[in-house]
Amino acid sequence: MDIAIQHPWFKRALGPFYPSRLFDQFFGEGLFEYDLLPFLSSTISPYYRQPVFRSVLDSGISEVRSDRDKFVIFLDVKHFSPEDLTVKVLEDFVEIHGKHNERQDDHGYISREFHRRYRLPSNVDQSALSCSLSADGMLTFSGPKVPSGVDAGHSERAIPVSREEKPSSAPSS
């Protein structure tokens, strides 16, 4: 049996009645209304595609803030527990690694892993770095800055992740 592969810019005549393409899905994330009824947008206009910005913004984008007094990283890690996260400082970098083995959810089995690496400003006091995970899954890594000319200290060490019972005060995307 031959299966015709079709370029995504073209639709079949019965396109609204075919399910969306497999690679358009965000695995491990929740479904939105337009995911359940994709034919509605196609009946309005055959060339209209639902925007995926909402899904992309909710998929774990980080925010880095560096002002005069402190350096802060906010990272959405809602699918990970503190035991699944490892935060290390290696010279001028902070490495955040999250991994959980295969576990069952509503749709079957899933495993996740990510690795992020950020450069620390040279004037961040590495002896006073802290990391916490809020109740809503926002990881906050922060450290105060020292005045220029003072040694900020550079070493390799692990930063423990503490759990907070309140939601994060980080801005939502």
Curated annotation (Swiss-Prot):
The keyword Chaperone applies. Acetylation at Lys-70 may increase chaperone activity. Glycans are attached at residue 162. One of its GO terms (biological process) is protein refolding. GO terms for cellular component: cytoplasm; nucleus. Residues 52-162 form the sHSP domain. Keywords: Acetylation, Chaperone, Cytoplasm, Eye lens protein, Glycoprotein, Metal-binding, Methylation, Nucleus, Phosphoprotein, Zinc. Residues 144-173 are annotated as: Disordered. Residues 153-167 have a biased composition (Basic and acidic residues). The modification N6-acetyllysine is found at residues 70, 99. The modification Deamidated asparagine is found at residues 101, 123. It is found in: Cytoplasm; Nucleus. Contributes to the transparency and refractive index of the lens. Acts as a chaperone, preventing aggregation of various proteins under a wide range of stress conditions. Required for the correct formation of lens intermediate filaments as part of a complex composed of BFSP1, BFSP2 and CRYAA. Belongs to the small heat shock protein (HSP20) family. This is Alpha-crystallin A chain. It comes from Zalophus californianus. The lineage of its organism: Eukaryota, Metazoa, Chordata, Craniata, Vertebrata. The gene is CRYAA.
